[in-house]
From Swiss-Prot:
Residues 249-274 are annotated as: Disordered. Glycans are attached at N168, N176, N182, N199. It is found in: Cell membrane. Plasma membrane transporter mediating the uptake by cells of the water soluble vitamin B2/riboflavin that plays a key role in biochemical oxidation-reduction reactions of the carbohydrate, lipid, and amino acid metabolism. It is a multi-pass membrane protein. Keywords: Cell membrane, Glycoprotein, Membrane, Transmembrane, Transmembrane helix, Transport. GO terms for cellular component: plasma membrane. InterPro entries: Riboflavin_transptr. It catalyses: riboflavin(in) = riboflavin(out). It comes from the Eukaryota. The lineage of its organism: Eukaryota, Metazoa, Chordata, Craniata, Vertebrata. This is Riboflavin transporter 2. Its main location: membrane.
């Protein structure tokens, strides 16, 4: 039942980041209801980086106590925690607690931290677990990981998150009975942004996220125990006695590997290359491995931290529709890149480098528009809206393809390589977030605009 295994691998991957991705797309609905206000994204960035204690623990265990940590119990624990945390979030996200003379959304922040631990730790446990299955299922897993961002975005659009209408401030205040003696609203006809009620509440959205985590848990159970999946598993000794020394991968000669598992380097005498390093199969030299991991860290820094932190600044000046189109279509581009990699797995390091440069170019354009906010280039034209949406889509498409291909390459290098793959993913994301946090939240280098009152010269 190859199809069943593909479906389960996709559903399993979908649970990797669905919780945090869901919280991010729900922010426009949450922020007006809590005392932290628009500081919440900055707090979330810090919480996610603090949650890297999870992957740090797993990575150190693999480094200093190889073979002592089985990913399966860890995965059961973190996915179960994700189910409980998202369920509690549905009922406690609006609750506040007096703390240090002010009210804070302590339950929301604590639950967000726990979900960050779940999702960050998945990067160094889900990927190594996929070594139990054939190499063709790794790309399917990445498709599911991409869908973990797509599904919450689509549901949020159906919910109506962030839909804004402009009304005359004086009229709105009179209608609400809020225009008093000390009111600063005059008769100047100033417009006021009003967010319309969502089609369903944040509570329903968080219950949906909890259901998604339950689906992930069920998929993981079936991947471990379904008879049809068991027939396709690799040799179990890899996860028993063989895991400690990780010799099973080294014992496989390149000449006996299936064609799709061979690393594809354009060198004509690659099959005669001697072992060049002690890492994995040793097929790649030290500089080549360094290049792979540096690119992996760079790509994840851009896609997971640097550009997402300024997405609103780059898109909202062009209008709310541009922002939602960019967010949704970029989320679609991720699984599309995984599908492309499934049928066109070009593992050339030269191609990886070129695609990284191209994707970085699109990211540079996005960053430039964010820097010029609230009046970026072509802000009053349809071409400006089109360009920013296309830039986001191509940025995510190219760099997502790079991430998937690097994952496939490192999968061929063995279990340890995938563990370090997950660690580098988190390292790159952490460095990107730590570099952007002071720029956005402390120094205020990026300026926001009012969707109804900001005026830009044409």
């Amino acid at each position: 039942m190859t199809l069943l295994t593909h479906v389960l691998a996709c559903l399993f991957g979908m649970g990797s980041w669905v919780a945090i991705n869901g919280i991010w797309v729900e922010l426009p609905l949450i922020v007006p209801e809590i005392p932290e206000g628009w500081y919440l994204p900055s707090y979330l960035t810090v919480l996610i980086q603090m949650a890297n204690v999870g992957p740090l623990f797993v990575t150190l265990m693999h480094r200093f106590r190889p073979g002592k940590l089985d990913e399966r119990p860890v995965i059961y624990s973190i996915v179960g925690l994700g189910v409980v945390a998202t369920f509690l979030l549905a009922f406690f996200w609006k609750h506040t607690v007096p703390l240090a003379g002010a009210t804070h959304s302590v339950p929301l922040l604590v639950l967000c931290f726990l979900l960050s631990v779940v999702d960050c730790t998945s990067s160094v446990t889900f990927l190594p677990f996929m070594m139990r299955l054939g190499p063709q299922y790794l790309t399917t897993y990445f498709v599911g990981e991409g869908v973990s961002g797509l599904v919450p975005a689509v549901v949020a659009l159906v919910q109506g998150v962030g839909v804004v209408h402009c009304r005359n401030a004086t009229v709105a205040s009179l209608a609400n009975g809020t225009l008093g003696v000390n009111s600063t609203v005059g008769a100047s006809g100033e417009l006021q942004a009003q967010y319309q009620p969502a089609n369903f509440s944040a509570q329903v959205f968080f219950l949906f996220l909890s259901a998604m985590m339950v689906v992930c848990l069920a998929a993981f159970l079936l991947l471990n125990h379904h008879p049809a999946v068991a027939r396709e598993k690799k040799c179990e000794q890899y996860f028993n006695g063989g895991l400690a020394e990780e010799k099973s991968d080294q014992a496989l000669s390149l000449s006996h590997r299936p064609q799709e598992e061979k690393p594809m380097i354009s060198s004509p005498d690659s099959h005669r290359r001697a072992r060049q390093s002690s890492f994995g199969t040793g097929f790649y030299s030290g500089p080549e491995l360094a290049f792979i991991f540096v690119v992996l860290a760079w790509v994840n820094a851009l896609t997971n931290a640097v550009l997402p932190s300024v997405q609103s600044y780059s898109c909202l000046p062009y209008g709310n529709q541009a922002y939602h189109l960019a967010a949704t279509m970029a989320a679609v581009a991720n699984p599309v890149a995984c599908f492309i990699a499934m049928f066109l797995p070009l593992r050339s390091l030269v191609l990886i480098g070129l695609l990284t440069i191209v994707g970085t170019g699109f990211g540079t354009y996005i960053m430039a528009m964010a820097t010029l906010s609230p009046c970026p280039l072509l802000v009053h034209s349809a071409s400006g809206t089109t360009l920013i949406v296309i830039a986001w889509v191509l940025f995510v498409l190219t760099l997502s393809y790079v991430k998937v291909i690097i994952g496939v390459i490192l999968r061929d290098e063995g279990h340890s390589a995938l563990v370090w793959c997950g660690a580098v993913v988190q390292l790159g994301s952490m460095l990107g977030a730590l570099s952007m946090f002071p720029l956005v939240s402390v120094y205020g280098l990026f300026k926001s605009g009012d969707p109804c009152n900001t005026k830009c010269t044409k």
